């Protein structure tokens, strides 16, 4: 086929967009076909130079351009890096030669177009050209000047579809924030009709009367001065993208951010952030709006003229606009009037006090009942309560927003309490010199079970313990003295760590050895049951006579589970035993049997398993307490509790004082040591309400 036939066979074809190609593009294609045909037939040009055949290995290779221009991109022709390119100069399109728009990858859909421009990189928000760029219809920087006519979409469509001037600032109002928020770029929305009618393209070319918008602003002229927050700047998170083997910057930034989040997952919030009471580094995002006017601004709906993000909440509408930047506390005490519902609720003298378990993160002791109902918690109070009480929208009469700050934390509350022990785990390893005598403790437990329970219940407990006895023998037969000492060190080290958890959780909690001996107890458990901590740990004499039966024997026979006088003469003479209290001494008969049956299944079974059931705790009652339980004064006190409810810690201590039992729901689990032997038992107790008792599934 000759060249003329090829020319006649070539017809204008539509491009990918469906439009007919430019005739100049068709001429360029015909010229390319002619050169190719001459190279195939003749092999060389008439002047003796090398052929331009694409398959000729001696042909000089053209360097591939980084990005083709718009005209060459549409024509699918090779372009160059120079602007204007040689093809556009040849066609007379040098004035309109600019880079073509590439299709974004999926992971770059959320990135603005301006951030993908060459030379901008991660400094898009700090780039000087950013203020002079118009916005396209989707809010990103446009690269084509013809796209300015499609821009101007507002956040909420109005009948005129007027655009917003986002990046260009005008004169700041006195209600703006004095500090820069690092959460997002600052938006200063104009709420007047004139400001909202200006388009983005016209606002760039108009001279600005405000020097803060036309030139580099100073700190005194513009409190928003300073670099914009760039969330894509890798220097913000202290990792170098050049050291990562990634072909694209956004992939390396995402990988670095995941690594930054993983390494900082265990960090605790700084003390300065706690004192400020802020979310983030210096506060929330700043949106300077004027909701007093009738025109909706950024974040406002044109229907109800209310802020879209914050709604009608008067507390959030009172966010400060003029408090000093160094002041980081919020005054919440003035928002709600003191003589309103809270003061009316606490003014009753006969109202039951709340049972305060925990007072703060720096104190591990429960506050007294007299200090718990106090309303004043160290908040700064001002005249804001009157403004909020009488204003429906929470605004004062003069239209200025009062400053609400977070509660000022006391400096001494952030320090460690006096009663908190010095945390030095080295003392645990230095103090343990001998292994713990588990064999003797199991013998003492067996003797106590035989004295306390009937023969039938003793047989049930013995069967449960006999089922796990071979496992104990198999796991301990290879252990020598050093292993047993190390086992005790592990127990003491774990217990040393658990004591802080027990004091901080505020739930009645006890920790036992595998023999059932109490090793640690919380204050709330002592309040609930009346058992002192020193008595439970074996540091004080155990004078308890409550075994779960009736205090006065009935005629004929004694009740099941009552105390039987089968105790040795030595123990009668010396009730102060040198060992801690067993768990079986704290539960009634049925609860003890159920516990050991569950313990036999869980001791060497599921290492992460737990048991949740109900039980009856036995109150610590001496002979004097048993006599007091039968008096008329105690009967009147129980009636008072049924009518008025719990009144502080004294009321908690009086639960079950009549019959000596407290019905509880408790959950416990077994923790094993490094030898896979049950090491300790952790128990949490809860007093169920009347509605909760009927819905317990166990």
From Swiss-Prot:
Annotated DNA-binding residue span(s): 69-97
Biased composition (Polar residues): 38-55, 137-223, 269-293
Family: Belongs to the ERT1/acuK family.
A GO CC term assigned to this protein in UniProt: nucleus
PROSITE patterns found in the cross-reference section: ZN2_CY6_FUNGAL_2 (PS50048)
Function (record text): Transcription factor which regulates nonfermentable carbon utilization. Activator of gluconeogenetic genes.
InterPro entries: ERT1_acuK_gluconeogen_tf, PAS_13, Zn2-C6_fun-type_DNA-bd_sf, Zn2Cys6_DnaBD
This protein's name: Transcription activator of gluconeogenesis acuK
The entry's keywords: Activator, DNA-binding, Gluconeogenesis, Metal-binding, Nucleus, Transcription, Transcription regulation, Zinc
Recorded superkingdom: Eukaryota
GO MF, any single term: zinc ion binding
Entry keyword Transcription: yes
Region annotation (Disordered) ranges: 1-62, 137-229, 264-305, 388-422
Organism of provenance: Aspergillus clavatus (strain ATCC 1007 / CBS 513.65 / DSM 816 / NCTC 3887 / NRRL 1 / QM 1276 / 107)
UniProt key word Thylakoid: no
Listed GO biological process terms: cellular response to starvation; gluconeogenesis
